[in-house]
């Protein structure tokens, strides 16, 4: 049976094994997919041992995506630009291919929820790895502009410069963020994980059509509830669909078969994935 795994720290609450189990069942396949705790100071050796023992592919989650990028022998064009890898595949010649499926999973979830991207003004809160992974896939759909806001303005500006040749993208600190009508606001920070709000002024959300929190939750996150408090018409989405979407794209990278996403998202939201 082909072996796969997800590596992270912490990892015990990962839904990836249950998600990939459902993918395999739906496609009539059998795989062995496990969650593996990688020591903070020993990620590369842990992953190398897994592949040396016959592993076919791996997912990589926090905080190891940059290390996975560094250890890949070959990178997809998107992974190369993003500078982070969440999917590793052992190729026929034994080398490791690094890919990043986060952005594709994110955009596929937006489209599945009938969220319009083209011609829209988009605000991304945060300038870390999660934001970095979604900017280019968003720009591929030709929004009016993508604005990145971060506590450290320089980090947002540097991220914007990285993608400037691909579309209209800019970066700001919270204190000088332009008061534009943002149709789609994305919280890419981990604030909801800690039950905290990003430092965004409420004036920026009054005309928001869609608020998306990348944090996966069975209930509305603190960010989603905050937006709803000031704008009851806003469509609220959490990271469930992105989680399943990026996993489906990883499955496709490994096995050249694309699983159906929506049934697994529904099972995840109902707490039925074990």
From Swiss-Prot:
Signal peptide: none annotated. This is Shikimate dehydrogenase (NADP(+)). Its EC number is 1.1.1.25. Transmembrane segments: none annotated. GO terms for cellular component: cytosol. Shikimate binds at residues 14-16, 61, 86, 102, 216. The gene is aroE. One of its GO terms (biological process) is aromatic amino acid family biosynthetic process.
């Amino acid at each position: 049976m082909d072996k796969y795994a997800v590596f992270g720290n912490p990892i015990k609450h990962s839904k990836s094994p249950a998600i990939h189990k459902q993918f395999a069942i739906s496609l009539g396949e059998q795989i062995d997919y496990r969650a593996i705790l990688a020591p903070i100071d020993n990620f590369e050796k842990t992953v190398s041992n897994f592949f040396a023992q016959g592993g076919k592919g791996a997912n990589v989650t926090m905080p190891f995506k940059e290390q996975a990028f560094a250890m890949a022998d070959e990178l997809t064009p998107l992974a190369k630009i993003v500078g982070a890898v969440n999917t590793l595949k052992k190729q026929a010649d034994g080398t490791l291919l690094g890919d990043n499926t986060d952005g594709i999973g994110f955009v596929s979830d937006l489209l599945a929820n009938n969220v319009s991207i083209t011609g829209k003004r988009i605000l991304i809160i945060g300038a870390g790895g999660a934001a970095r992974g979604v900017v280019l896939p968003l720009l591929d759909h030709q929004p009016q502009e993508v604005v990145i806001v971060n506590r450290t303005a320089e980090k947002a500006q540097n991220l914007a410069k990285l993608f400037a040749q691909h579309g209209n993208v800019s970066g700001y600190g919270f204190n000088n963020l332009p008061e534009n009508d943002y149709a789609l606001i994305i919280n890419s920070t981990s604030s909801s994980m800690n039950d905290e709000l990003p430092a965004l002024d409420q004036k920026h959300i009054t005309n928001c059509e869609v608020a998306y929190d990348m944090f996966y939750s069975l209930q509305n996150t603190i960010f989603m509830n905050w937006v709803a408090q000031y704008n009851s018409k806003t469509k609220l989405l959490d990271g469930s669909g992105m989680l399943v979407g990026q996993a489906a794209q990883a499955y496709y990278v490994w096995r050249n078969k694309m699983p159906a996403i929506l049934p697994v998202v529904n099972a995840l939201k109902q707490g039925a994935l074990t």
